[in-house]
């Protein structure tokens, strides 16, 4: 709880033992404003969410065993031969019917004389619960709980656990109670035996014995002691629930001579108050024959699993008691799925109105073969009439033919006539879908749209609520999907479809034109200006710029015309012009170099990984301006001292560390990437953002938002990763976290305390203050991201850094993003091939394998790979070499093109500079410790002014300075610049012998300063004025034809032969040399301040009192590079 009495979402989810997503969903249902897991809400709102979540968990609480209420027959559902329970569908209560204690009916001889005793009979259709007191029905022998003697109707459970299809008819009044009949003599006393419903085909058997397959028999009402209940703990919901039949049990009254059951009168439609037991995902629809192993009373297979129920029960109206109007008793049983491939067309009969069927996807269990007789022939299930229904295939969500499509309410289903042909003139349900598909020229091979068949589907959706309602809606929609039609029926399509096909042939070209016009019209109508545009190669044509700005090219040409530039649509514009035009339209411009490097271009998780994903540690990149305390913050997290050992106290590499912390009582790992903050290391920061899952933006509380802070924000946005702001140095004087929040809000980063969604944590790295809170926020943010990877595949990842070690050879820092990297794996990193010889982590501990989100240093590459390239492990070296060869040729062509572009100089400009003597070149050979440093130095050299001095880098590579480098420098007159590297044996001696200048640096600041000084040294020096002093004319003396000015030196000094300017008022009357300087009739070289002297010039004699003489001299000065 916060100090203001509010509660965070993640604290509320922790109290309730739920995920943050569930609490956020509940808040959204209650219209409570909560943007993320760390949002704050009031205690009242928290109480509403708690009550809603507790109400949503009530059905789960009701599933626990409780003492049954008087008059309720609580039944347990358990598969025979299994010790575990599975939830079962509650059965509708019999309205106002009281029945005596029933016992399993004694088996009688089957009526069919053709059936031998040894052959197991196929289970028949389940009997519905009867309203008569003399006949009770249950799909299978239930296991009975305790029940009081009083017989009361069982109350209906809440519709949340068993949504039913409601029918808009008046409610049926309760039926009159039927007097209870006396129980047979064999029944036990009422007080000693619990009451249960007896199925007519149940036979007394031991409780633990597997059920035997029953024979068709005449129902006989007897009572017997119920079987002993197994020791397994039942799970019941609400009302009496029959054990889920492994196949449809024998139907009562199905034979031709069976008596019609007594039905209590009711005004409601038949079957409106009944439901049928729920089937699992692999169960057949009611009325369909049963496969072996699923028939009622059939011995279960050894090791059978507990029955699983998929989804929620679906009411099938009229399925409870077919004798009441769903189908006349004694009639032939209709086929469960209509005309199936193995069923005669005449076997199907219409379904009663309001009947709803459900198709469910198989839940991954293998199909069960059809039942077989001992001689190997398939068993024909015995029905309840003279006709029998052959076994059919198990229905799935996508049946093989339209004959298995779900029926419409009222019994009509297209194509259900004899032979599977649809009625002539009857419009098909998916004609509109076909017309749309033909218009869009999309192939009909794909699965068609899901159509919900039924008139009262809204009532089904209305009853489906709560947290589990969304899942049930999805299952229901899939179950009612109409399947695609076979090719034979598509050929015999009605006339409208044929007309559309003819039109399609005639209008192909017109349709293409129409679609092009629609796209153009939509683009013109949209006219939405982008937030920013990214210029790929520092130039764009007018048409390309117009497309990016979503304006007409004529608008761009008009804008340029008013600026004095005559342009055409194909003319290329340089970067300043693009920025000027884009700013006129209110769109900022970004260069593509860095933003493209920060975008995540390769998806590391492939489709085959989806079944094997596990949670992986998050990768956190620490970014920010230089000297804002990024490495110190990581030191506080790791409890190490890295920053103290860095040259100049600044980070110049990407450091990869893995930290293990305690969170919610369990160890959690975080992989940190520490990026440099200096402006030269832009590419390094972009690479760090490309592989990260969350970015930590470090901002100093005493310095605020700086240029590299803005750059880091743009990197994180380009990579589309969440940002957590750490406001560091809050312990310093002058620290103002609120000022930092204000500056960040100007960059659209609004703190949660101010109503935004960005987590901002004030920390102190030096005093380790609020470090735990920062780590907790990082874990909470990454939990929402749901980071996963597949560790059971070959590794893939990114090269974070690479360098050449003189002892180990090429070394690369690899971040494994998916899979597991092992010693001996063949790795291809861009155009570089390697075989992992050894791996070490950030603590220099050797590893044999590295899982997802691990950063390791790997040895064994053939050359130094390029930082930022993706690497991938291949099963053998042959396949890896083939991939690397193609990449190497592409990289070579790209490198040559870049070199030619960098050396492209205008011949006229070069000859003009050569004639003027202004063409200066500084040749460099650059060697650094790692690839990232080489990139940073080259990028910084590109920023230096090149108007008068050209910098040519003849060679740039990671590694030590060799004797070959010295020979190249001697031949080209180059300077060797080393950065954090050493010289090989013999290189120093060769450099001294050839007079090659070798410079070594360990801080990038000093390196760039010296190179700029060397470039300025190539420039010609310039003459500048240096002030000497001033004097005032107080008297004028005429000597011959010339005149001498008697002066008093006010400031500085006067020197003989210096330059002077004579000021008279605001006008300069003379500028020239001072030829004569005397004091007391003696020639002197200079006169200091406070002395009088005589000043004479050969070319000026018009002195006047009050003139001011300014003395200066011209000196040579080293030129500076101008931008």
Curated annotation (Swiss-Prot):
Keywords: Cytoplasm, GTP-binding, Initiation factor, Nucleotide-binding, Protein biosynthesis. Residues 320-339, 412-422 have a biased composition (Gly residues). Its main location: cytoplasm. Coiled coil: none annotated. GTP binds at residues 624-631, 674-678, 728-731. Residues 674-677 are annotated as: G3. Pfam families: EF-G_D2 (PF22042), GTP_EFTU (PF00009), IF-2 (PF11987), IF2_N (PF04760). Residues 764-766 are annotated as: G5. Residues 170-187, 207-217, 258-268, 388-403 have a biased composition (Pro residues). CDD domains: IF2_eIF5B, IF2_mtIF2_II, mtIF2_IVc. Residues 624-631 are annotated as: G1. It is found in: Cytoplasm. Residues 52-452, 480-512 are annotated as: Disordered. GO terms for cellular component: cytosol. Residues 728-731 are annotated as: G4. One of the essential components for the initiation of protein synthesis. Protects formylmethionyl-tRNA from spontaneous hydrolysis and promotes its binding to the 30S ribosomal subunits. Also involved in the hydrolysis of GTP during the formation of the 70S ribosomal complex. Belongs to the TRAFAC class translation factor GTPase superfamily. Classic translation factor GTPase family. IF-2 subfamily. This is Translation initiation factor IF-2.
């Amino acid at each position: 709880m916060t100090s203001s009495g509010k509660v965070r979402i993640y604290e509320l989810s922790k109290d309730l033992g739920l995920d943050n997503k569930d609490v956020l969903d509940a808040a959204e249902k209650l219209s409570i404003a909560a943007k993320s897991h760390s949002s704050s809400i009031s205690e009242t709102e928290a109480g509403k969410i708690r009550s809603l979540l507790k109400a949503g968990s009530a059905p789960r609480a009701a599933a626990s065993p409780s003492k049954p209420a008087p008059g309720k027959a609580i039944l347990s559902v358990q598969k025979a031969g299994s010790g575990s329970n599975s939830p079962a569908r509650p059965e509708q209560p019999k309205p106002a019917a009281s029945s005596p204690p029933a016992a399993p009916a004694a088996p009688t001889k089957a009526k069919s004389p053709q059936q031998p005793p040894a052959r197991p009979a196929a289970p028949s259709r389940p009997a519905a619960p009867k309203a008569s007191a003399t006949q009770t029905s249950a799909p299978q022998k239930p296991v009975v709980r305790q029940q009081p003697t009083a017989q009361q109707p069982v109350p209906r459970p809440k519709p949340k656990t068993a949504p039913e299809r409601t029918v808009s008819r008046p409610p049926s009044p309760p039926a009159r109670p039927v007097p209870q009949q006396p129980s047979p003599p064999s029944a036990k006393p009422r007080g000693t035996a619990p009451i249960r419903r007896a199925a007519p085909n149940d036979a007394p058997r031991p409780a633990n014995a597997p059920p035997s397959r029953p024979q068709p028999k005449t129902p006989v009402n007897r009572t017997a002691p119920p079987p002993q209940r197994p020791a397994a703990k039942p799970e019941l919901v609400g009302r009496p629930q029959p054990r889920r039949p492994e196949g449809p049990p024998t139907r009562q009254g199905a034979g031709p001579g069976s008596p019609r059951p007594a039905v209590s009168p009711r005004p409601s439609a038949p079957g409106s108050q009944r439901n049928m037991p729920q089937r699992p995902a692999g169960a057949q629809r009611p009325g369909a024959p049963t496969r072996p192993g699923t028939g009622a009373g059939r011995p279960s297979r050894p090791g059978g699993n507990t029955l699983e129920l998929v989804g929620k029960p679906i009411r099938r109206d009229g399925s409870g008691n077919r004798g009441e109007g769903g189908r006349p008793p004694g009639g032939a049983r209709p086929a469960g799925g209509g005309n199936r491939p193995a069923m005669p067309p005449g076997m199907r009969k219409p379904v009663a109105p309001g009947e709803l069927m459900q198709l469910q996807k198989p839940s991954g269990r293998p199909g069960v073969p059809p039942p077989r007789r001992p001689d190997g022939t398939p068993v024909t299930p015995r029905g309840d009439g003279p006709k029998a229904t052959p076994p059919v295939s198990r229905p799935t969500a996508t049946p093989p033919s339209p004959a298995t499509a779900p029926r419409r309410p009222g019994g009509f289903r297209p194509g259900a006539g004899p032979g599977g042909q649809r009625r002539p003139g009857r419009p098909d349900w998916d004609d509109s879908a076909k017309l749309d598909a033909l218009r869009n020229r999309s192939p009909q091979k794909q699965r068609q749209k899901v159509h919900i068949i039924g008139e009262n589907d809204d009532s089904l959706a209305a009853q489906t609520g709560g947290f589990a309602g969304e899942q049930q809606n999805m299952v229901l929609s899939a179950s009612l999907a109409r399947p695609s039609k076979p090719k034979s029926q598509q050929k015999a399509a009605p006339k409208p479809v044929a007309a559309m096909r003819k039109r399609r042939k005639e209008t192909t070209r017109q349709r293409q034109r129409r679609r092009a016009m629609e796209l153009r019209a939509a683009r013109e109508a949209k006219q939405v200006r982008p937030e920013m545009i990214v210029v790929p190669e520092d130039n764009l044509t007018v048409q390309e710029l117009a497309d990016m700005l979503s304006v007409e090219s004529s608008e761009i040409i008009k804008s340029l015309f008013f600026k004095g530039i005559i342009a055409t649509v194909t003319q290329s514009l340089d970067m300043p012009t693009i920025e000027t035009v884009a700013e006129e339209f209110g769109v900022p411009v970004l260069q593509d170099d860095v933003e493209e490097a920060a975008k995540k271009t390769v998806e590391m998780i492939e489709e085959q990984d989806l079944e094997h994903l596990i949670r992986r540690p998050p990768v956190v990149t620490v970014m920010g301006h230089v000297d804002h305390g990024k490495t110190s913050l990581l030191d506080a997290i790791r409890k190490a001292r890295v920053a103290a050992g860095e040259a100049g106290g600044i980070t110049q590499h990407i450091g990869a560390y893995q930290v293990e912390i305690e969170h919610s009582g369990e160890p959690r790992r975080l992989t940190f990437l520490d990026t440099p903050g200096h402006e030269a290391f832009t590419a390094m920061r972009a690479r760090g953002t490309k592989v990260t899952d969350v970015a930590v933006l470090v901002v100093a509380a005493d310095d605020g938002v700086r240029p590299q802070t803005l750059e880091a924000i743009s990197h994180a946005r380009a990579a589309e990763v969440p940002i957590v702001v750490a406001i560091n140095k809050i312990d310093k004087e002058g620290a103002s976290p609120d000022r930092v929040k204000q500056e960040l809000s100007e960059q659209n980063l609004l703190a949660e305390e101010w109503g935004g969604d960005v987590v901002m944590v004030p920390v102190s790295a030096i005093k380790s203050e609020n470090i735990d809170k920062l780590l907790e926020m990082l874990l909470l943010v990454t939990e929402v991201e749901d980071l996963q990877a597949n560790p059971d595949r070959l590794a893939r990842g990114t090269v974070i850094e690479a360098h050449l070690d003189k002892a180990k050879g090429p070394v690369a820092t690899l971040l494994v993003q998916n899979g597991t990297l092992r010693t001996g794996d063949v790795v291809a990193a861009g155009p570089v091939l390697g075989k992992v010889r050894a791996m070490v982590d950030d603590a220099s501990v050797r590893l044999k394998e590295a899982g997802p989100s691990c950063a390791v240093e790997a040895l064994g590459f053939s050359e130094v790979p390029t930082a930022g390239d993706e690497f991938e492990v291949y099963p053998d070296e042959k396949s890896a070499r083939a991939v690397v060869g193609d990449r190497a040729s592409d990289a070579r062509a790209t490198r040559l093109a870049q070199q030619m572009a960098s050396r492209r100089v205008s011949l006229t400009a070069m000859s003009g500079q050569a004639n003027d003597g202004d063409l200066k070149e500084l040749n460099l050979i650059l060697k650094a410790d790692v690839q990232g440093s080489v990139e940073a130095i080259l990028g910084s050299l590109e920023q230096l002014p090149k108007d008068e001095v050209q910098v040519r880098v003849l060679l740039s590579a990671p590694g030590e300075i060799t004797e070959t480098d010295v020979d190249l420098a001697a031949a080209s007159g180059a300077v060797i610049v080393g950065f954090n590297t050493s010289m090989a044996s013999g290189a120093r001696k060769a450099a001294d012998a050839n007079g090659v200048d070798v410079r070594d640096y360990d801080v990038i600041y000093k390196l760039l300063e010296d190179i700029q000084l060397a470039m300025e040294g190539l420039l010609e020096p310039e003459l500048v004025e240096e002030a000497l002093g001033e004097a005032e004319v107080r008297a004028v003396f005429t000597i011959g034809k010339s005149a001498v000015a008697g002066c008093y030196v006010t400031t500085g000094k006067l020197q003989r032969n210096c330059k002077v300017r004579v000021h008279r008022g605001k006008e300069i009357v003379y500028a020239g040399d001072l030829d004569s300087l005397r004091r007391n009739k003696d020639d002197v070289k200079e006169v200091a301040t406070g002395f009088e002297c005589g000043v004479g010039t050969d070319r000026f004699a018009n002195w006047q009192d009050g003139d001011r003489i300014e003395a200066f001299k011209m000196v040579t000065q080293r030129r500076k590079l101008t931008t």
